Amino acid sequence: IAEDMSPTLGCYGDADAYTPNIDALAKESLLYTHAFAAYPVCSPSRSCLITGMYPTSTGTGQMRSAFPLPAGTRGFPEYLRDAGYYTTNNAKTDYNSADAARLVKDCWDQSSAKAHWRNRTKKEPFFAVFNDMISHQSRTMVWPHEIFQKEVQSKLSPDEIHNPSKLRVPSYYPDTKSIRKSLARYHDCVSVMDQNVGRLLKELEEDGLAQDTIVFF
């Protein structure tokens, strides 16, 4: 799961995106062209992902909601656990509900920054979620330049760092210096996120699981 993602990927036609790992995955995958987030804000959208229900149905549409879920609502990983799957979440649990703690307890065998399918019993089927924060607005727009250089640009080669002056500015944005800077930072973060996706795909290969695992991005 990536945060604050627009279709800023090569496989969706963004000529400025450098996302070789996701693009390679897309070439051998089903590519959704008419799929949209259930809600435009992160926590309400996450409540949809964990329950499989629209925030308008669960009462979780208000950001930072403490509203309880409708009676009997379960997180869908609970059903996977019932079926014998080892379920892991790495690591965000911002489910925007008074029931968030219960969802964490009932949905996940492991939920932490160390959660991984490799912690399961060998041959046990698994469902593993990895939440990549690097494209979150707090990183793309808020981090001071020094932190951004350390956490993002230091992981990219000079050719992979996006030059604000060379980016294509979508017509719905004003073509200003500030907008170009924001777009460049965002594209850099997405490039690092792509590296992280590549690392997970490599781990599946190393474990001999690549041909037996369904990967959703």
Placement of each model-derived feature along the sequence:
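Formylglycine-dependent sulfatase
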Residues: 1-217
